[in-house]
A protein has these predicted regions:
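Glycine-rich active-site/cofactor-binding loop and its immediate structural neighborhood
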Residues: 100-136
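Active-site mouth loops of central-metabolism enzymes
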Residues: 107-115, 157-164, 212-217
Length: 345
């Protein structure tokens, strides 16, 4: 892995913002004939989604369409004006590693549905954006091939299986491939019987894993507190896209109470309908250390391949930097809960 320095990271981001490639769109299922918007003309992630929609069949696009943003709309900023923001610093520390920005490519399965190269392109795009990619155990490419494409850190996400030894073996393969952290998903819909995900089983996996161990799918302060008691090092506040439970709170709504329950004793991450840099800033203010980006990464992948992934992540990095400057927060440590006001429904 190439060592991350601030100069290298800023240089990479600057190259991204200055780039203006004119891409000739490959016509895929569902794409009408005509001009595909060049990446340099894109203004926000919703425009990337529009290109992806043109390139995918209706059935495939429906799996990554939309997102519930109502919770974000109920939050507003309380900026500080008399602050020097000439030098913005997005870097953050997570599990002993310095990240250029607190924005990661989240785990998503079977990415060849969206682009012929699938996770290989996502790995290259994430590396070009100087960020971590979290690889799903349900990837369409072997973890070893994905790792060969990655120039920045990989994490690994795994689902419970009936055979706990099979889960342990998957984790060992990921560690051997160079993954820096492992994330066990709990509470997601499963097509088959799954292992008994009580604390005893989780503890068996955690104690046999030499890299940081996270739980993804925690949505209550009580379970977050229990996770800390049981030695979990990181928690991803997530409703798995709210695909299986009507009436479930948005992850961003649960974040403040979960942050209070954890009390800084585990690293909090979050996903769930993040589409703008301001969304990321709100999550950081409410207690998250980093944000996982899911569907928009797949929009970029479907629209432009690896370059589209880089565009999506780089766009969010740039928007976060701009929002930090406008809010009077020159670095990540300066972001706290006083920045955000949550309005009653």
């Amino acid at each position: 892995m190439i060592p991350l320095t601030r100069r290298r990271a800023l240089g990479s981001l600057g190259s991204l913002l200055a780039a203006s490639p004119l891409l000739e769109g490959q016509e895929l299922i569902g794409e009408p004939a005509g001009r595909i918007t060049p990446r340099a003309e894109l203004v926000n992630l919703f425009e990337v989604e529009a290109v992806a929609k043109r390139k995918l069949s209706g059935a495939v696009y429906s799996t990554i369409a939309g997102g519930d943003r109502r919770a974000f709309d109920r939050m507003t900023f309380r900026p500080r004006m008399l602050v020097d923001v000439q030098k913005l610093d997005l870097t953050t520390q997570l599990f002993g590693e310095t990240l250029f920005a607190p924005i990661l490519a989240g785990p998503m399965s079977d990415q060849q549905r969206f682009h012929p190269e699938g996770e290989l392109a996502t790995a290259r795009g994430s590396a070009a954006a100087n960020t971590v990619m979290i690889v799903s155990s349900r990837s369409s490419q072997p973890i070893e091939k994905i790792a060969a494409q990655a120039k920045t850190s990989l994490w690994y996400q795994v689902y419970p299986e009936p055979d706990i030894e099979a889960v342990r073996k998957r984790i060992q393969q990921a560690v051997q491939a160079g993954c820096k952290a492992v994330c066990l998903t709990v509470g997601a819909p499963q097509p088959q019987p799954r292992m008994k995900t009580d604390w005893s089983a989780i503890d068996q996996l955690r104690k046999g894993t030499a890299i940081p161990f996270l739980l993804k799918g925690i949505m209550s302060p009580e379970e977050a507190h229990a996770a800390v008691r049981n030695g979990i090092q990181g928690i991803v506040v997530s409703s798995h896209g709210d695909l299986h439970t009507n009436g479930l709170a948005a992850p961003i709504e649960m974040l403040p109470s979960i942050a209070d329950a954890v009390g800084g004793n585990a690293s909090l991450l979050i996903d769930g309908s993040f589409r703008r840099g301001t969304d990321v800033l709100k999550a950081l203010a409410l207690g998250a250390r980093a944000v996982l980006i899911g569907r928009p990464v797949l929009w970029g992948l479907a629209a432009y391949g690896a370059e589209g992934v880089q565009t999506v992540l780089g766009m969010l990095q740039s928007e976060l930097a701009r929002s930090m400057g406008l809010s009077g927060r020159p670095n990540i440590k300066a972001i706290d809960r006083s920045l955000v006001k949550i309005h009653v429904r």
